[in-house]
Amino acid sequence: MMKQVFGILAAAMIAGLLALPVAVLADGHGFDPDEPPPEGKGSVYGTVTARPHKDYVKKAKELGSKEDYDDNDPYAGSADGKVVYNDTMVNYDFADVYAILLNPAAKPGKVHEVEAEGDEGQKPRALAVAFGDIIRIKNATSKPLTYFLADINGDSIQEIPLLPPGGSADMTVELVGDLELTTDEDDSLITAVLSREGLQSQRVRSGSTYAFPNMNPGEYDLLFWFWRLGILKRKVTVEAGEHTDVDGVLSVDTVVR
């Protein structure tokens, strides 16, 4: 009888897990591609992954298959052929990456938080924002900081007044392009900022699912971005009553810089 109960519970748990939506949106609502979109609407969803260069992975696997591989070799793998990450490398299995949809109908004004933490550096390391969004900056260090947002490919720049220790301020994004948010006093406090008009984004763990539901039919630009790798660009057509599946893999041999 007990085995039967456990069997029923296990089946219920598995059924419950399988019924979970493939993505949890920023507002806490789930997205399920098996559920039809609202009338007249469509959606875009998929998986976005960041990975090392395929040649790097190949060499790591080859070295990992040798019993006498050198632990100090920057390409060294493990005995099972998996890449071993050291302190100077990015573990792309855990990197936060962005799925971005450029939607002319999107309204700006979303608030993004950035915090300078002294010895801990500045978090987050990257932001995807829309023109007109707000970056809320908190100075959690022990020194005054002068923040500015600059176009890395041009001369455009915007600043906020000196921010005292413990202070915070809002900066409305007035620039479009590939930007950096940093300070005059400490250039180690830096955040890569991708800014576009009509930008909608989801920040997810590498290998996770993103979703943009309830979209009007039409053609959109879809971007996948990780600040260490660059941008992967796609065109996507949203059709009424349809969920469009678009996956993205970011690596040094697939992105546009």
Q: What name fits each language-model region?
A:
Residues M1-G7:
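Positively charged n-region of N-terminal signal peptides that target proteins for export
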Residues L9-P21:
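Bacterial N-terminal signal peptides
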Residues D27-R257:
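Extracytoplasmic copper-binding redox domains, predominantly the cupredoxin/blue-copper superfamily
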Residues P21-D27:
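Signal peptide processing junction and immediate N-terminal pro/mature segment
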